[in-house]
Amino acid sequence: MDLFKMLGQFKDMQGRMQTMQEEMSQRTFSALAGGGLVTADVDGKMQLKRIKLDASVVNPGDIEMLEDLIVVAVAEAQKKAADAMQMELQKVTGGIDLPFKLPF
């Protein structure tokens, strides 16, 4: 294969990856914990954007349970974002596994 052609394809893939990253950063991924008592929203960069608590879960006598529910909801929302990013990345790269971890 022609080296210049390969470099051109790589440059094209870089552009598509940048576009995909920008699009993903605009998406929101939500997850529930405790049967919907805690909701966490993260963006496509896996940054926490919102925590929503049902009033019934706020019990001063059981803060540990609330903390656990928040951790579960955030982790699940981040997993959804990571899974979506992986799917989009597979589309951009044509299924080629990249030998490095992307910073998002």
UniProtKB/Swiss-Prot annotation:
Location of this chain's protein in the cell: Cytoplasm, Nucleoid
One term of GO molecular function: DNA binding
Chief location: cytoplasm
Keywords from the named record: Cytoplasm, DNA-binding
Cellular component aspect of the GO annotation: bacterial nucleoid; cytosol
Pfam families: YbaB_DNA_bd (PF02575)
Keyword Ligase applies: no
Cited SUPFAM superfamilies: YbaB-like
Function: Binds to DNA and alters its conformation. May be involved in regulation of gene expression, nucleoid organization and DNA protection.
Description of how the protein assembles with itself and partners: Homodimer.
HAMAP family per UniProt: DNA_YbaB_EbfC
Family of this protein: Belongs to the YbaB/EbfC family.
The name this protein goes by in its record: Nucleoid-associated protein GAU_1113
Organism encoding this protein: Gemmatimonas aurantiaca (strain DSM 14586 / JCM 11422 / NBRC 100505 / T-27)
